[in-house]
Regions:
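Metallocofactor- and cofactor-centric catalytic cores in central/energy metabolism, strongly enriched
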Residues: 2-139, 153, 157, 161-166, ...
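A conserved active-site cap/scaffold subdomain adjacent to cofactor or substrate pockets
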Residues: 174, 193-264
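Internal helical hairpin/lid segments
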Residues: 238-331
Length: 376
């Protein structure tokens, strides 16, 4: 019964008639636009919804999607993957991370390759599983390779808190959490007219944690409307409609479409936990985008005893590594190209043999185009 009720709930947000009604409303309002608009979705979940339900086909020619760096696996630069690989190859280490990381290629191979060579690499759904792994392997160091935007950062913070509270001696952290607003600012700059970002569909799960307040600056300082939008197709179409209406009415505002989950302030308890254990890095390098100031997190200095980057500093590679010369993942992550613009898309680069990270992750734009490409 519970599953049926849940299905009925989802059905409301996937209702074809409602989607069609929003498509008609968008088309009607779009006739009043003074120029075409490009809307960037900053969330990989949005990209997959857009592709899965063929939403580009429902939009008029003067309303266009630009795909952003909304996938935490995709934006991880190769040198960070190399860190994971090197750590995994240590005899006394069990490397633990989230599942999408398994096939992401570094310069020496992926974690899947490391596992094939005998490394103990484990993939979990929750960081808290590290506690059990550490308890069952007291002679090994369990290193949690933490990834994700604001959405998953609180879960890592909870694990840090438990490790300290329980005095677990054999869990370390390699922190790769990144934050969304800083890279949005970076993406606005230095764009040609064709790829200009006119508005953002704000990510939903990120905003549950951080609140919509983190986007205040975009309408005020950059004249870019932001509508925080849910994952379902009805959500996406309503969010697009709200953006188009802002342009028609010559407004530039922060709005929340996803009001059933998101509010302005966000989860204050989660934010406090993040603040307690993490601080901003001066610089974090994003794949394809480059160095973005204050966009990455690290453990606070007082927790250096748990920081794998410090403890293993002497063996971790320092060189920045660029993508394969035929891979345009970086250009796609900046919203300056789409997957089908890549010459190796669907041929040399497929989910079974990924060349770039955008084809690896379940949230990657290339994976979405490969899976649902016939719909657009």
């Amino acid at each position: 019964m519970a599953e049926l009720e849940l299905k009925n709930l989802y059905d409301d947000f996937r209702d074809g008639k409602t989607i069609e009604a929003y498509a008609k409303l968008i088309a009607q309002d779009a006739k009043k636009l003074k120029k075409p608009i490009n809307i960037m979705e900053v969330c990989g979940g949005h990209t997959h919804t857009i592709m899965k339900f063929g939403l580009p086909q429902l939009l008029p020619d003067n309303v266009n999607f630009i795909h952003g760096p909304g996938c935490p696996v995709c934006i991880m630069p190769k040198e960070r993957i190399d860190h994971a690989y090197v750590l995994a190859m240590q005899e006394d280490v069990i490397l633990v991370t989230l599942g999408d990381m398994i096939k992401v290629p570094g310069s020496n191979g992926s974690l899947q390759d490391a596992r094939a060579k005998g490394a103990d690499v484990r993939f979990v759904y929750s960081p808290m599983e590290c506690l059990k792994i550490a308890s069952e392997n007291p002679t090994k160091r369990v290193i949690f390779f933490a990834i994700g935007f604001e959405t998953t950062t609180p879960m890592t913070a909870v694990l840090v808190e438990q490790v300290i509270k329980l005095k677990v001696p054999n869990i370390l952290f390699h922190i790769n959490h990144v934050t969304v607003p800083e890279v949005m600012v970076e993406l606005i700059a230095d764009r040609d007219e064709e790829h200009q970002i006119d508005a953002f569909l704000g990510p939903s799960h990120v905003s549950v944690i951080s609140g919509s307040k983190i986007y205040d600056k975009f309408p005020k300082e950059y004249q870019k409307p932001v509508v925080v939008t849910g994952f379902e197709p009805v959500d996406a179409m309503q969010g697009i409609s709200m953006i188009v209406k802002q342009f028609v009415e010559e407004r530039c505002e922060l709005e929340i479409q996803y009001k059933r989950v998101v509010n302005y302030d966000g989860n204050l308890q989660a934010q406090a936990l993040i603040e307690k254990y993490f601080e901003k890095r001066d610089i974090f390098r994003w794949r394809g985008i480059g160095d973005v100031a204050k966009s990455g997190l690290k453990l606070r200095d007082e927790f250096d005893a748990y920081n794998a980057e410090i403890i293993y500093d002497n063996i971790l590679p320092k060189e920045e590594i660029n993508d394969h010369k035929l891979c345009i993942c970086g250009t796609i992550l900046r919203g300056m190209a789409k997957p089908k613009d890549c010459t190796i898309f669907g041929t040399a680069c497929k989910p079974t043999t990924p060349v770039g990270s955008c084809m690896v992750s379940s949230e990657g734009a290339c994976a979405a185009y490969y899976k649902y490409g016939d719909l657009v």
